[in-house]
Amino acid sequence: MEENKGDWNDEFVHHWKYYRGHARASPSDLEFIKKKVLEKIEKYNGDKSKVKFLVLGSTPEYRNLCGELGITCYCFDFKKYNFDYLAEEVKNKPKEIFTQGNWLESIPAELANEKFDIILGDCIPNIIMPEDFQKLFENVFKLLKQDGFFMPRTYIKEKNEKLTSEEAIKKYREEGSKKPVYTWVGRELYVSSYKEGKDRIIVNRTDRY
């Protein structure tokens, strides 16, 4: 029997239009980011061409925000396919510059000499392994201006919030209906597997930063 192996990236981009919060940026998330971008525009005395904005991935909400504000959007993604496919979700299309590569490897030559005011990464901490955090932050540090912002939106566990995997699956059966489990109840599954007081990530600061 031939094994059919899918690409998890395809699942995300193909179902993006069906996601809801927390799986995609909410209006309040975007309002917060917009405020930070406007601060940078003010810093440059209204010259939007000086604002450098990088998305790790191809998140359409962030690209749309750039179009709304009239600034160039750099996207750095594993696959050009993701960038092209999600372009259909971008209503206010900005000027875009795409670079293909891996955030956890050496920074591609196209970006090596760039410095950004704002770097966004939608749920990046949820899709990389704990041992890769150090490399991610090192690369982000190299790409950020000294007063730049890195905002990796992620799932948050509320204080004292508890869920079981059974509750997560029940929610999926009641609401998900044939949608991929992870894309529908991913956050709930993360919370259900969290070990109170044990699961945490510590990233060492080093001279390399």
Residue ranges and their predicted role:
Residues L104-I119:
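A short acidic, Gly/Pro-enriched loop at the edge of an enzyme's catalytic core
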Residues F149-Y190:
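Conserved class I S-adenosyl-L-methionine
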Residues D132-F149:
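A short glycine-rich, Lys/Arg-flanked "PGG" loop and its adjoining helix->strand segment in the class I
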